[in-house]
Amino acid sequence: MLIYIHGFNSSPASAKAKLVKARLEALGRGAEFVAPAVPPSPAQAADVLGALALRNRGAALIGSSLGGYYATWLAEKHAMKAVLLNPAVRPYELLAPMVGLQKRFHTGEEYVFTTEHVAELRSLEVERITPSRYLLIVTTGDEVLDYRWAVERYRGCRQIVIEGGDHGLSDFGNYLDAVLAHCDAPR
């Protein structure tokens, strides 16, 4: 099983989620893919994702941006493998200025992001990681996040640092084989 966790204001309809799903379907493994709609509240997100992890023991995670932060929390809490795509590091700092009305990119759904949500994000921070669980993929051209924070945070993990690129990881398809190989490798 592979659980895809989308980023802030994104959705299961993201281009990367669709690519993973299509590849798994082409391999006859479509039933092994799940991409939940992550609630705006980090506490609710933790509940939803934690329950999903418990129902799918042995699953691997792919987390994009804020989804990478959640994937790190889940990977350490439930001893799961994870691929992190331009992951958010210290998102409670990055998103604090975003408090207020937000709109999801793919659905147009509006919600209010609050200071409580920022505090909930902080509560999910993982102090120590287990490097062997992770594959980090970052782009030096990420216009949203400083890739160096992730390189430092995930030191000791397998890393693919792509020169240039963008936050959405437009050339993600070029790395899908490495992503699936990491997810499918024995623990």
Model-derived features: positions:
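Aromatic pocket-lining residues of Rossmann-like dinucleotide-binding sites
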Residues: 74-78
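Short active-site oxyanion
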Residues: 57-60, 133-135
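The alpha/beta-hydrolase serine catalytic core
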Residues: 80-187
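Gly/Ala-rich beta-loop-alpha elbow adjacent to hydrolase catalytic centers
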Residues: 62-71
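Active-site catalytic motif of lipid deacylating hydrolases and related acyltransferases
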Residues: 1-56
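Short hydrophobic segments within beta-strands
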Residues: 4-8, 62, 137-139
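Active-site phosphate/pyrophosphate- and oxyanion-stabilizing loops and adjacent acidic/basic residues
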Residues: 18, 22, 72, 148-151
